């Protein structure tokens, strides 16, 4: 498990962390910026994240979810890892705003 954690930290350092001048969503300036998407959207990074995060999902859980776009690869990876571990845990994706057409859902997926 420690090897997985170290490998993930290395990937985050190499692919997610940036040093420079950045304007944050708050409007503040920062010399540091972390964008985990290059890691969570890679096959290796997603597998490592899912492997490490599934340990924190309670045994009686039926779904994992999070806000789109950042959580999308994580919840899908965790759901897949759960399936291959013999557990039934679905993925849910939460929109920032309701979809403007069709069912106008805020939460996508098989809701419990």
Show which residues each predicted segment covers.
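Active-site-facing substrate-recognition patch
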Residues: 1-59
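Short helix-loop-beta connector
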Residues: 58-62, 111-112
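Glycine-centered small-residue hotspots that permit tight backbone geometry or close packing
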Residues: 45, 65-66, 100-102
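Short glycine-rich phosphate-binding loop at a beta-alpha junction
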Residues: 60-70
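Fold-independent oxyanion-binding glycine-rich loops
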Residues: 36-37, 67-68, 94-97
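Conserved hydrophobic/aromatic pocket- or pore-lining residues that grip, position, or stack substrates
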Residues: 27, 64, 91
């Amino acid at each position: 498990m420690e090897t997985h954690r170290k490998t993930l930290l290395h990937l985050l350092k190499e692919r997610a962390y940036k040093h420079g001048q950045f304007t944050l969503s708050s409007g503040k300036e920062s010399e540091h910026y972390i964008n985990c998407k290059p890691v969570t959207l890679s096959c290796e990074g997603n597998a490592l994240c899912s492997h490490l995060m599934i340990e924190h999902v309670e045994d009686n859980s039926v779904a994992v979810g999070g806000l789109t776009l950042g959580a999308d690869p994580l919840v899908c990876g965790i759901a897949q890892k759960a399936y291959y571990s013999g557990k039934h845990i679905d993925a849910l994706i939460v929109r920032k705003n309701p979809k403007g057409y069709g069912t106008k859902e805020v939460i996508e997926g098989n809701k419990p």
